[in-house]
Amino acid sequence: MRFCEGSIETRVPSFDGVPLDVNVALPADSVADAPFPLIVRMHGYNGTKDGPYLGGDRGPSTYTMYTDAGFAVMTFTARGRGASCGTDASRRATPEACARGWDHLGDARRSIRDVQYLSGRLVDAGLVEPAIGVQGGSYGGGRGLLLATLRDRIQQPNGHYTPWTSPEHGIDMEVAAAVPFIAWSDLTYALAPNGRALDYAIGSDTLSRAPLGVLKLSIVQGLWRQGQAHYNAPPKSDPSIDLSTWFDAFPSTAPLTETSRHAAREFTRHHAAIGVPLDRPPAPTLIANGFTDDIFPVTEALRWVHRVREAFPEATIAQLYGDFGHRRANQTSAALLAPRALTWFQRHLQDAEASAPAGVEAFVQSCEGGFGARHHADTWRELSAGELRLVDSTGTTVRSDAEHRRVSRLIDPPSGRSPEIPSSSCRRAHRAPAPGTASYTFAPVGRTVTLMGSPTIVATVTVRAAHHALIVGRLWDVDPDGKTRTLITQGIARPPSAAQETGGATPFVLQLYPNAYPLADGHRAELQLLGRSTPYVRPPTDPFEIQIERVDIRLPTVETPVKEPAGKDQNAAAVSVPAPRVLPPDMRWAPGYDPSDR
């Protein structure tokens, strides 16, 4: 390949003059063969143009995977990081240009505009085609999904959308292929979920803010610590990205403030694909999220897919899910994603007859290392055919002060960095008692059952709280001896505000993060509901109690209902026909889920 490496001295001024540190790699072919199809690779939150990228790529391998296949590749350090005004040295070199070159955390009006402007410069130079590809993970993935959804539009500083054209010659441009992985679609919901998202329904545009959710504290604290190395806007200096103020603006149980509402609006409207108006289909997108990624779970992908499919049923989307992503995930996505990404770009940027991914691929979690069985279907719904179901009306109370702290720390996603806690998606813990929490234990399964999808809890609750309450759900795999259990998945929600206002019993639907998990013969599923989970969830500042009067727990399975043969344990948990889904009054069915269509 031919490689142009940027430096502080050769930075490229962006659309607003902020200097950006850029690398460009071209295939070894003659320049006479230009223009080449371009792939923009975008780094993660704590990275720079040098990576790390997918699979920990740094150095030449960042580029050669694609340049060897005839693509041009551009990488650059996002504004406010590294030599793009992030270091003291870079700001001293160009103090005026860097004065407001702080981190904008994927804002479509600036961070995304940088990608569009830089690639437009290469188009104007005649080096690359105006239909580009984008790829990135985590922070790069969130930006990639936003670019795919914008497709051929720019979001101006005033929030309006205009056609995307190259800066000098006005050539029409678009994203023609995107591979975002372990990404968010709604940054507000990803970092502070309220539990209203359902994998079979679509909510209003304010779903993630009504009510405002509960902060994933250990995650956001970790990001904030890493972000101290960036150039951040001084407090109160930029209302579009006031991170230092916003960090404390997501309370757990205290009253909400206008600052918290403003932060949530900014994140959803300008930092997230879910906030982009869908007046055209997105670019062909291969989206990949991790079942065991407790930062950006599969929920983030499904919300975007359902929204797009509702508006554009024929949109080109492929989905890939498995045990990869941010901790506690096993972080081994390269073997799955790299070859699929290459064929995706070959198909959509080079018109090659490549066998590109299609439909939904889901790999079962394996505690033995690597990936478990592969399942494929045309849609998310078709991956599961039955369910394990448990209904309990005995009633119990969940308190805001109750948890087993050691267990909570053990399953906290970033805790895998600690020497005493293995970095594994299969977090195991003793079945420690925790008074003030609720547990619901299924009968043991009589054969191995593959859980596939989002565990669903339909509950009737009464909340007693001065302001707000929260609830954490954990689904466990309990060993046959009943002493040890493995975390399958978890989730966070706010119980309905109506219950807080009236003190009366209110129906509530909560889904935990989706997973594909093998529940072995003789093992039991166990749901635990708590009022706190420290340090993953910001602890309550005001006491509350949640009276759970009835729960209907549904665990979707790959297996279909079958009549167990004579001699089988008739007390074993059996796969049944899925019960009718419950649609909250402020939501509508996602494509393929409306019972009246069947």
Residue spans for each PLM region:
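N-terminal cap/lid segment of alpha/beta-hydrolase-fold proteins
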Residues: 1-34
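Glycine/threonine-rich phosphate-binding loop and adjacent beta-strand/alpha-helix elements that clamp
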Residues: 6, 10-11, 352-598
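Cap/lid segment of the alpha/beta-hydrolase catalytic domain
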Residues: 34, 38-117, 121-123, 468-472, ...
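Accessory cap/linker subdomain of secreted extracellular hydrolases
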Residues: 51, 59-60, 68, 83-115, ...
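Alpha/beta-hydrolase fold nucleophile elbow
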Residues: 126-139
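Short beta-strand/loop motif that positions the catalytic acidic residue
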Residues: 281, 287-289, 293
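Conserved alpha/beta-hydrolase "acid-adjacent" motif
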Residues: 294-302
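Catalytic histidine neighborhood in serine/cysteine hydrolases
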Residues: 308-327
